[in-house]
């Protein structure tokens, strides 16, 4: 799976491409920081305007909106370009995988579900990595940029449970996010979601293989297909009930998450020690930090799918390696026999 980063043929795409993607994501985060500052200034201006008629001019108001449009336009442009480039980067990664599978396909074709691994799982791997990989890197960059901002905004503000401790908001976001993530990771492990997804794909592969065989083999009876499809049905129904339990916990937590920043800011809001602009900056920065910390929580279903794809591809590659070892052993034995026969003739 990772020959893309080891094969000299792909070094330029692998390492220069990765550098371009990382740099572009960093620029996106920097623009996001500027947008967060804009929210503070804009809502302070709104508060000033609502407190006293004509405290601001219409020109100042339009200028502020234009400033946001400029920042948003830059963000959109960078996001679109990095998305486009990432697509090409990941297709090259998939190509590196597929080329190796093609080179050993005379052996790999003997493995059950080989065609599905080479075609379906490689495209799944690249698509999941597109969304999951870039979002993980962006989440880490957001933490690096927004945590100092949240520290600065927290100074001198009373926080629920933590009082005026300057690290209250960051620690609150950390505890809330880690607590929720651990809860759902534990729930996913208890429900064995990765295993269920893996079993589901194996049953589907067996059913598909029998359908392909049935196209050319008249001895395959409908009853055989029905039995296989019954196995597919059972594993699907099991996955539905498992994900039902998981989604109850995940969605309930995400809904409660909407109020978390307001709960921690309750003493400061009631005491009136923050302006509307500062409150918006804090809530947005808190949301960005919290959202990054909850990356695993929000991406958990996709992570489960990626883990399942990774497990199948690793198993597939292990079987190919085993076949190559067996073939090498046979080749060695055949050479040994030839040399022995030659030796006997000489004597």
Could you say what each language-model-derived stretch is?
Residues 124, 200-207, 211-260, 302-305, ...:
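An intracellular "coupling" helix at the cytosolic face of ABC transporter transmembrane type-1 domains
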